[in-house]
């Protein structure tokens, strides 16, 4: 059967959609492999998923406003392109599918230089730098958003965001995570690598909001730490329904820093890494970054979000992603540059049952189950359009 190579890497937002689509194509009888950065997290994920992996060097390119490119990164990018050309010329795949991010670029550009058909998947609401470099010669682009800034809509097909479409029964997930049934569960997650900002700010914010006992404030409680109208919709009459518990995935590198901050709060559970399916299956509210993978998983599980976009994200794509979710009524955007008190207010407002229910309904409407299957359909359409030309053997100059 035909071989399809997924060019991906860098972050989970690029890698996991590739893995989901790879599994779908493999189920249809295709041979599938991943190509990404040597030693990158994609290599370990491919191994765990039983996917063949081809590693190449990958260099980060400077974006507009970032100054001149680093010559060392340009050298790595050139080396990676040559390595990818040699590998793909030997494999002669039917197509290469690019998922964005600097680690995908060598595979996609090498395929295009060899005449191998390329298809792209754009996960964000704004076309990324690496995708802009490849889009002109790509056969088609599957998108996670109905409108993508910088992408000709005639070349785009809305397929959604391929994610792990798995759920756990709530009781089973709570038990696996060591959480109780009953309290509102707030999940804090900074993406596949964690978030320094969320790790530094959120524990203090949640302690100020919910105190040592872990309860939302109600009538008769002491003056709240921020200026809120106590007659507002955030008030909760039933004391039991005011209980909260937190599941905070810090990322392995920051676990030791965060743990001491919350060790006296029995309702605040910290872990370096968490099983995402279990976490999303119990979350009633998420405090997260705004990578498209995170937003797609939130929609699939119907979890409302308070989103703090990563300001350094490529082309500020996380902000544009988050705005689209907020406009749909499924979350609230709080920019990192604002005062922590603003984040406190938004979290408390979104924790209220009525607000959470409305946001949950909006999140579920955003979900597009079956995205991996739809993108696989698009790939198959392009494979049937014309046979893959035979890749030429690399020359001495390649």
From Swiss-Prot:
Any one Gene Ontology molecular-function term assigned to this protein's record: glycosyltransferase activity
Protein function: Cell wall formation. Catalyzes the transfer of a GlcNAc subunit on undecaprenyl-pyrophosphoryl-MurNAc-pentapeptide (lipid intermediate I) to form undecaprenyl-pyrophosphoryl-MurNAc-(pentapeptide)GlcNAc (lipid intermediate II).
InterPro entries: GlcNAc_MurG (IPR006009), Glyco_trans_28_C (IPR007235), GlycoTrans_28_N (IPR004276)
Annotated compartments: Cell membrane
Name of the molecule in the record: UDP-N-acetylglucosamine--N-acetylmuramyl-(pentapeptide) pyrophosphoryl-undecaprenol N-acetylglucosamine transferase
SUPFAM superfamilies: UDP-Glycosyltransferase/glycogen phosphorylase (SSF53756)
Reaction equations catalysed: di-trans,octa-cis-undecaprenyl diphospho-N-acetyl-alpha-D-muramoyl-L-alanyl-D-glutamyl-meso-2,6-diaminopimeloyl-D-alanyl-D-alanine + UDP-N-acetyl-alpha-D-glucosamine = di-trans,octa-cis-undecaprenyl diphospho-[N-acetyl-alpha-D-glucosaminyl-(1->4)]-N-acetyl-alpha-D-muramoyl-L-alanyl-D-glutamyl-meso-2,6-diaminopimeloyl-D-alanyl-D-alanine + UDP + H(+)
Gene that specifies this protein: murG
Record family assignment: Belongs to the glycosyltransferase 28 family. MurG subfamily.
Keyword Transmembrane: no
Keywords noted in UniProt: Cell cycle, Cell division, Cell membrane, Cell shape, Cell wall biogenesis/degradation, Glycosyltransferase, Membrane, Peptidoglycan synthesis, Transferase
One GO term describing the cellular component: plasma membrane
């Amino acid at each position: 059967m035909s071989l399809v190579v997924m060019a991906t890497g860098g972050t989970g937002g690029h890698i996991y959609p590739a893995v989901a689509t790879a599994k779908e194509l493999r189920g249809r009888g295709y041979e599938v492999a991943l190509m990404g950065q040597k030693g990158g997290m994609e290599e370990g994920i491919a191994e765990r998923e039983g996917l063949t992996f081809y590693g190449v060097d990958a260099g980060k390119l400077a974006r507009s406003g970032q100054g001149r490119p680093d010559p060392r990164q340009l050298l790595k990018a050139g080396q990676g392109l040559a390595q990818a050309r040699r590998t793909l010329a030997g494999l002669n795949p039917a197509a290469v599918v690019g998922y964005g991010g600097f680690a995908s670029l060598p595979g996609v550009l090498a395929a295009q230089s060899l005449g191998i058909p390329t298809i792209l998947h754009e996960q964000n609401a704004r076309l990324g730098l690496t995708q802009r470099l490849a889009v002109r010669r790509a056969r088609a682009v599957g998108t996670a958003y109905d409108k993508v800034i910088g992408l000709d809509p005639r070349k785009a097909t809305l397929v959604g965001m391929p994610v792990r479409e798995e759920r756990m029964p709530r009781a089973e997930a709570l038990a696996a995570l060591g959480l109780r049934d009953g309290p509102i569960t707030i999940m804090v997650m900074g993406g596949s690598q964690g978030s320094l900002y969320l790790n530094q700010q959120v524990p203090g914010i949640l302690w100020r909001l919910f105190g040592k006992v872990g309860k939302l404030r109600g009538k008769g409680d002491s003056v709240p730490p921020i200026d809120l109208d106590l007659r507002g919709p955030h008030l909760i009459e039933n004391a039991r329904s005011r209980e909260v518990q937190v599941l905070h995935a810090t990322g392995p590198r920051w676990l030791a820093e965060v743990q001491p901050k919350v060790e006296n709060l029995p309702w605040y559970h910290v872990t370096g890494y968490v099983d995402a399916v279990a976490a999303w299956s119990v979350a009633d509210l998420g405090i997260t970054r705004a990578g498209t993978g995170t937003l797609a998983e939130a929609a699939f599980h119907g979890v409302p979000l308070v989103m703090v976009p990563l300001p350094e994200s490529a082309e500020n794509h996380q902000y544009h992603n988050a705005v689209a979710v907020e406009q749909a009524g499924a979350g609230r955007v709080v920019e990192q540059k604002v005062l922590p008190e603003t984040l406190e207010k938004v979290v408390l407002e979104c924790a209220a049952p009525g607000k959470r229910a409305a946001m949950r309904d909006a999140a579920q409407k955003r979900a597009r189950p079956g995205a991996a299957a739809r993108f696989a359909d698009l790939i198959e359409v392009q494979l049937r359009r014309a046979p893959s030309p035979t890749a030429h053997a690399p020359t001495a100059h390649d």
